[in-house]
Amino acid sequence: MGLSDDEWHHVLGIWAKVEPDLSAHGQEVIIRLFQVHPETQERFAKFKNLKTIDELRSSEEVKKHGTTVLTALGRILKLKNNHEPELKPLAESHATKHKIPVKYLEFICEIIVKVIAEKHPSDFGADSQAAMRKALELFRNDMASKYKEFGFQG
């Protein structure tokens, strides 16, 4: 189920457009995640008290977390499925410390695609979107596999 060279070209090409403004992209991803799937916000003690979009937008912690999420994802994507060294500690923390269900990874991955499509409509056509979805599915599947290794059924 790996990606072809052409698919990786699409993924890394759009990621190069995302990277210069990870904080804005990441902030939007986190806010959208909380809007569309409010149950995910309950996983974050530091975000539980943020009740409005304005509060979420003005939170430096939301921006910081969004940047952290997309920075980690970018490192994994750039490794083109040779991501074991980056993925293992991420999966371990999400499985054993944070207890983030795989379902939530599905939610955030789809939101990442939507946010990129909104911010880069002319650069993120159907082929690029399909390639990104495939790369993110690979990431989720590998995270789920690691979760099981850590005894978390997530």
Swiss-Prot record:
<feature type="binding site" description="proximal binding residue">
    <location>
        <position position="94"/>
    </location>
    <ligand>
        <name>heme b</name>
    </ligand>
</feature>
<feature type="binding site">
    <location>
        <position position="65"/>
    </location>
    <ligand>
        <name>O2</name>
    </ligand>
</feature>
<dbReference type="GO" id="GO:0019430">
    <property type="term" value="P:removal of superoxide radicals"/>
</dbReference>
<feature type="domain" description="Globin">
    <location>
        <begin position="2"/>
        <end position="148"/>
    </location>
</feature>
<dbReference type="GO" id="GO:0019825">
    <property type="term" value="F:oxygen binding"/>
</dbReference>
<keyword id="KW-0963">Cytoplasm</keyword>
<keyword id="KW-0479">Metal-binding</keyword>
<dbReference type="GO" id="GO:0098809">
    <property type="term" value="F:nitrite reductase activity"/>
</dbReference>
<keyword id="KW-0560">Oxidoreductase</keyword>
<keyword id="KW-0561">Oxygen transport</keyword>
<dbReference type="GO" id="GO:0004601">
    <property type="term" value="F:peroxidase activity"/>
</dbReference>
<keyword id="KW-0408">Iron</keyword>
<keyword id="KW-0813">Transport</keyword>
<dbReference type="Pfam" id="PF00042">
    <property type="entry name" value="Globin"/>
</dbReference>
<dbReference type="GO" id="GO:0070062">
    <property type="term" value="C:extracellular exosome"/>
</dbReference>
<dbReference type="InterPro" id="IPR002335">
    <property type="entry name" value="Myoglobin"/>
</dbReference>
<keyword id="KW-0514">Muscle protein</keyword>
<comment type="subunit">
    <text>Monomeric.</text>
</comment>
<dbReference type="InterPro" id="IPR000971">
    <property type="entry name" value="Globin"/>
</dbReference>
<dbReference type="GO" id="GO:0046872">
    <property type="term" value="F:metal ion binding"/>
</dbReference>
<keyword id="KW-0349">Heme</keyword>
<comment type="similarity">
    <text>Belongs to the globin family.</text>
</comment>
<dbReference type="GO" id="GO:0020037">
    <property type="term" value="F:heme binding"/>
</dbReference>
<comment type="function">
    <text>Monomeric heme protein which primary function is to store oxygen and facilitate its diffusion within muscle tissues. Reversibly binds oxygen through a pentacoordinated heme iron and enables its timely and efficient release as needed during periods of heightened demand. Depending on the oxidative conditions of tissues and cells, and in addition to its ability to bind oxygen, it also has a nitrite reductase activity whereby it regulates the production of bioactive nitric oxide.</text>
</comment>
<protein>
    <recommendedName>
        <fullName>Myoglobin</fullName>
        <ecNumber>1.7.-.-</ecNumber>
        <ecNumber>1.11.1.-</ecNumber>
    </recommendedName>
</protein>
<dbReference type="GO" id="GO:0005344">
    <property type="term" value="F:oxygen carrier activity"/>
</dbReference>
<dbReference type="InterPro" id="IPR009050">
    <property type="entry name" value="Globin-like_sf"/>
</dbReference>
<feature type="binding site">
    <location>
        <position position="65"/>
    </location>
    <ligand>
        <name>nitrite</name>
    </ligand>
</feature>
<dbReference type="GO" id="GO:0016528">
    <property type="term" value="C:sarcoplasm"/>
</dbReference>
